[in-house]
């Protein structure tokens, strides 16, 4: 972060005329087609970043691909543009180009843009770039998620990013699952949910099943839903049976719904017993529906 900031002091984003942008893009496109790398000196990179503000989408794509092929050397100028350019098109394209590069050196600047830039496309592209960076982005994304000023739009973007990261390296969420903050634990579970549905990764399943015993009822309730969506009766039914006796109404309800979802016919007797002991009429109604549905199988 320090290295990028120190370099940014000498960076000044140029501007290109329509003719200059077209001429440069044509030359860059030819280099790319021949498998050649563009010049990576400061002046050349500066001109390419300036080209990201062109109103012609095809030209912007050529500049982005060229900067992406340069890689790490382009990060300082792209980060400067992302932070300080008054041209929203350049900020958007800079975030998208940092996504192409996918280097964690850009992470502090992407976090800042995600939190402070008011443009939704910049926020979305910054989140996408963090998702591409992967595991190093998990902690800052979860931190933002727990802040009171995190918007509903940002929450959606973060959940998408975390889900993508989870699909690539689910065990990177180990520390998040053990966080002291229940909101972070829930976010980590949701990020693992899709991965659990797509594969039979025993380590991922173990993390989710262990969350059924979490001290926070909201975490247990969320884990119960995920188990129902991602596991069969042999893998998760017995653990859900314990939650039919949970002290929290929502947890008991979710456990019954998940047993129905996984078609756990081995759970009919457990649901019968839970129905007889249930004092909440709404929860009892859900349990009865779940039992009756299972009896049809």
Swiss-Prot record:
Domain of life: Bacteria
GO CC annotation: phycobilisome
Keywords for the protein's UniProt record, in alphabetical order: Antenna complex, Phycobilisome
One Pfam family in the UniProt entry: HEAT_2
SMART domains named among the record's database cross-references: EZ_HEAT
Molecular-function annotations in GO: oxidoreductase activity
Similarity-based family: Belongs to the CpcE/RpcE/PecE family.
Stated role: An enzyme involved in the biosynthesis of bilin.
Name under which the protein is recorded: Bilin biosynthesis protein MpeU
Species of the source: Synechococcus sp. (strain WH8020)
């Amino acid at each position: 972060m320090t290295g990028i900031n120190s370099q940014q002091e000498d960076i000044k984003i140029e501007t290109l005329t329509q003719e200059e942008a077209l001429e440069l893009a044509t030359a860059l496109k030819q280099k790319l087609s021949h498998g050649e790398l563009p010049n990576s000196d400061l002046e050349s990179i500066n001109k390419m970043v300036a080209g990201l503000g062109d109103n012609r989408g095809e030209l912007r794509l050529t500049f982005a691909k060229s900067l992406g092929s340069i890689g790490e050397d382009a990060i300082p100028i792209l980060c400067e543009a992302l932070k300080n350019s008054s041209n929203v098109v350049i900020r958007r394209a800079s975030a998208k180009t940092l996504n192409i590069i996918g280097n964690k050196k850009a992470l502090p600047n992407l976090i800042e843009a995600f939190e402070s830039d008011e443009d939704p496309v910049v926020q979305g592209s910054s989140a996408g770039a963090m998702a591409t960076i992967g595991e190093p982005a998990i902690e800052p994304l979860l931190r933002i998620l727990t802040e009171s000023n995190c918007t509903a739009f940002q929450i959606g973007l973060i959940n998408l990013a975390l889900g993508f990261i989870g699909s690539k390296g689910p065990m990177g969420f180990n520390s998040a699952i053990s966080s002291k903050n229940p909101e972070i634990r829930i976010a980590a579970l949701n990020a693992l949910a899709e991965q659990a549905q797509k594969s039979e990764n025993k380590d991922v399943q173990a993390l989710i099943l262990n969350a059924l015993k979490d001290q926070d009822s909201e975490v247990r309730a969320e884990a119960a839903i995920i188990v129902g969506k991602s596991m069969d009766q042999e893998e998760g039914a017995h653990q859900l049976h314990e939650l039919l006796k949970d002290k929290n109404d929502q947890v008991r309800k979710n456990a019954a719904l998940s047993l129905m979802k996984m078609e756990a016919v081995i759970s009919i007797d457990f649901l019968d017993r839970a129905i007889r002991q249930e004092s909440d009429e709404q929860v009892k109604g859900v349990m009865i529906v779940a039992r009756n549905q299972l009896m049809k199988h």
